[in-house]
Each structure stands twice: as structure tokens, then as C-alpha cells.
Amino acid sequence: MRCPFCRHPDSRVVDSREAEEGSAIRRRRSCLSCGRRFTTMEEASLQVRKRSGAAEPFSRAKVIAGVRKACQGRPVRDDDLALLAQRVEDAVRSSGSAEVPAEAIGRAILGPLRELDEVAYLRFASVYLAFESLTDFESAIAALRSEAAGPPTTRDGPARPVPRGAVDVSPVIGTQQVHSR
């Protein structure tokens, strides 16, 4: 590694440590020429392959900027956006691939954004999933509502689906279970 002070091409690693929760390595180096010390950070690169075929480095800032547009006017804090971007990066990096298609980034954004703010999710999804009609919005809203309603429940807990033509013989007598959300 080139010394930032004297530009000498060689340096010696004095110390190495994990940084940023294990996603990077921090190295203290000493220049073999001038003896001055400096710090470097090493992180595995993640390339995003765009639809045009061009590749560019993954950028959390770009994820935040895109999601921020969908969150405009919504009660979403910058900390929430930073956490969402971190979750997206973690999900994309967990694929183990050094290069991911841009579509994978969009898919990785949808889940955490849905948890963060449903209106922002609909805004983002309408662009990312290319909604073309009111029916597309209605379908997405219906899916959100059915998820919010949760599965049907009985007095003893979650209802189990009964195959057509079968009789549900689950016990109705016994200990009552309390389920909270």
C-alpha cells in the first residue's frame, strides 16, 4: 500500500482488527521509507449490475436516496433509513456473490420498507414493480390488509386449515392458550 505522506509504494502492517461488525478490516500500517503510521480500511467490494449492463459499486447512500423519495412526507427518520439501507446491504451481501443485479437491490428493499411504512412501501413498489393500473394498487393494498389482519384465530389459538371434505376434530376442551401480537 502506498504511503499517503511520502508516496513510497511499500508499507508494513502493524495491527489488523475487524471493523463495522465484521464487514471490514481496519489495518494500522507503517511506511518502510518515512516510518509514519496510517490507517486503512478494507472491505469486500460489491458490484451492482444495472439493466444497461454497466456495473457500479453498491452504495448505501443511493439506497437511502431512493427510499427517501418514497418516504417523502411520511414520519420516517433518517436513522430508520440508515438501518433499512444496512439491512438491504446485509441481505444482498449474504447472497455470497460479488456482483448482484440491480433488481435484487429493489427486491431487498421491499421487505424492510414494508415493515417501516406501508404508504412508502406502496409508493416504492408502484415504481419498482411498474404498477400500470388502479388494479395493481388495489391488489397491493389488499395484500397489505390481509397480512395486517393476520390468520384467522379460534378461542384456543390460530385456526388450522381443514381440508375440503374433512372434519376438524381438534380438541376444544383443555387449556386455553393466550396469543398476543
UniProtKB/Swiss-Prot annotation:
Pfam families the record matches: ATP-cone (PF03477), Zn_ribbon_NrdR (PF22811)
The organism of origin for this protein: Frankia casuarinae (strain DSM 45818 / CECT 9043 / HFP020203 / CcI3)
Reported function: Negatively regulates transcription of bacterial ribonucleotide reductase nrd genes and operons by binding to NrdR-boxes.
Family statement: Belongs to the NrdR family.
Top-level taxonomy: Bacteria, Bacillati, Actinomycetota, Actinomycetes, Frankiales
Keywords linked to the UniProt accession: ATP-binding, DNA-binding, Metal-binding, Nucleotide-binding, Repressor, Transcription, Transcription regulation, Zinc, Zinc-finger
PROSITE patterns noted in UniProt: ATP_CONE (PS51161)
Cofactor(s) this protein cannot do without: Zn(2+)
Protein name per UniProt: Transcriptional repressor NrdR
InterPro entries per record: ATP-cone_dom (IPR005144), NrdR-like_N (IPR055173), RNR_NrdR-like (IPR003796)
